């Protein structure tokens, strides 16, 4: 019956997944255009940037009073007053795309293959002073527009001084900021006079009353350059898109001279804004199959290689020390214990064998521990498979949100394994409340994450961000969870209860618990946790920086090969360090290894991940909402890391303990 139920659930999941649009693999299903064919231009949300630079009057990069926001805005949010088509149509998106804030719509731009345009009028809008203040604030804080043409992000050309290479960076500026100086007597632009305190920087020459102003210029003209590949016989494919935004102050459409004054929105009056665009086509030798190569830029790979090689050597050294020390010590212990005359010498002996009557004693809160470990195993398998598939190239960045969608599906499927593990561990603890374990394992951790997401959703709603996950999407996720994951989890728990024999211990548990002697300071839980967490954290520290920039600032992350190798190092170090500390604790007659194995394996690394995320905020966070979102999501990431590494530490310790105590003779 259990097998049939699991089989039916898998068939239903296969049916649902098969009805969804297939994942877009590199080199599959290109769109071929003929001359004058329409090329759709889609618009996405406006997102913050990380390394946006202000410029002075000579065009040089200068530092400015820039804040960083961690939420995006809908392109057609009514305060932007962008031109709209006759009928705004939302484009279909994957589940992962919606979760990560994509809001893709059609646009009024008319692009036709090989049909160039010069200063084509788009529309005229009126931007009130209050909305002008809002737009100027986003310009000064480096917000980017994000367009999509034939599945490619409209980009800007970026030069990486470290690698001496150029690449295409997704998105382009909402506007520009010019840093200029003036005195109180000099006439300054209205936008600079009426902006709030953040326009005026702290640099001031009191004697001459010279102030430094940030003048935000709004981009209202777009030079669109489309690169195409000629396939012959009149067939063409889009292989690159660059957009150069220009700010032009004008009183009538049809004039696009860039030598005139730029447009700065007056925050005290209504502003008439004319939007225009130009289109050019450049033939390129780049084939369609390699068009993403220009976007998938690895920032300073030498740092990543250096970090991975160095830490790989550390892991090899650590592994050698741990394995050699344990094998040597255990070999000596086994020989001594198995030759021991229990009647004469047992009371004189010491070491981990003396714990044989307590080492398999059920810990306090065994139900909670089993649920956390099972949830950690579920997350571990999800992360491993997701990174592995991405490293092989199955999850292309051209399929927006595919990674998040696959992670959600895998997490639901691995609910079977997570619940099986949770129930097996609960049997290992001889827990009596198996029904509570069956119900809570698929609900506790996902429910906690859902509540946190809903709470953070309210903060996103407060600032009118496009990152708000719609209620319909949340209900759909919960529906899928109850339809697929929970039945699979129940099946895993029931099978484990009937078929899993982890409750068969190699030694019997005494009725009276053995007193634990005094432990050295470095083996106490908190110091041991802090020491053990250094090694797994070190294996992923470099990759965390790139993951954060991708999550918060809309950068394309495609270094999954580095990430997969780093995750392997994380797994090895978490396992080895926890086993080493568990062994030395047992040698000092501390038989309470269960919670220590989980905490030492997971809490230290999670703590360092959280501290790293806080140190990552060397940039200035803008506003209370941004701080709450950053701390909230960073806490979720750290807690999930704790579950993954904690489950690695616990299972490694459990297998180690069972192995060594099954290898000795106990009467």
Swiss-Prot record:
Signal peptide: 1-22
Glycosylation sites: 61, 282
Keyword Membrane found: yes
Transmembrane portions of the chain: 303-323, 371-391, 406-426, 443-463, 475-495, 528-548, 561-581, 597-617, 636-656
All ranges on the Lumenal side of the membrane: 23-302, 392-405, 464-474, 549-560, 618-635
UniProt keyword terms in alphabetical order: Endosome, Glycoprotein, Ion transport, Membrane, Signal, Transmembrane, Transmembrane helix, Transport, Vacuole
GO cellular component: endosome; endosome membrane; fungal-type vacuole membrane
Membrane topology according to the record: Multi-pass membrane protein
Localization, UniProt: Endosome membrane; Vacuole membrane
Highest taxon above the source species: Eukaryota
Disulphide bond pairs: none
UniProt xrefs under InterPro entries: EMP70
Pfam families tied to this protein: EMP70 (PF02990)
Residues with site note (Cleavage): 250-251
Membrane topology (Cytoplasmic): 324-370, 427-442, 496-527, 582-596, 657-667
GO BP: endosomal transport; intracellular copper ion homeostasis; invasive growth in response to glucose limitation; monoatomic ion transport; protein localization to membrane; pseudohyphal growth; vacuolar transport
Keyword Glycoprotein: yes
The protein's role, per its UniProt record: With TMN2 and TMN3, plays a critical role in the late stages of a nutrient-controlled pathway notably regulating FLO11 gene expression. Acts downstream of RAS2 and TOR. Essential for cell adhesion and filamentous growth. May play a role as effector of cellular copper homeostasis.
Family under the similarity heading: Belongs to the nonaspanin (TM9SF) (TC 9.A.2) family.
The protein, known as: Transmembrane 9 superfamily member 1
Native organism: Saccharomyces cerevisiae (strain ATCC 204508 / S288c) (Baker's yeast)
Underlying gene: EMP70
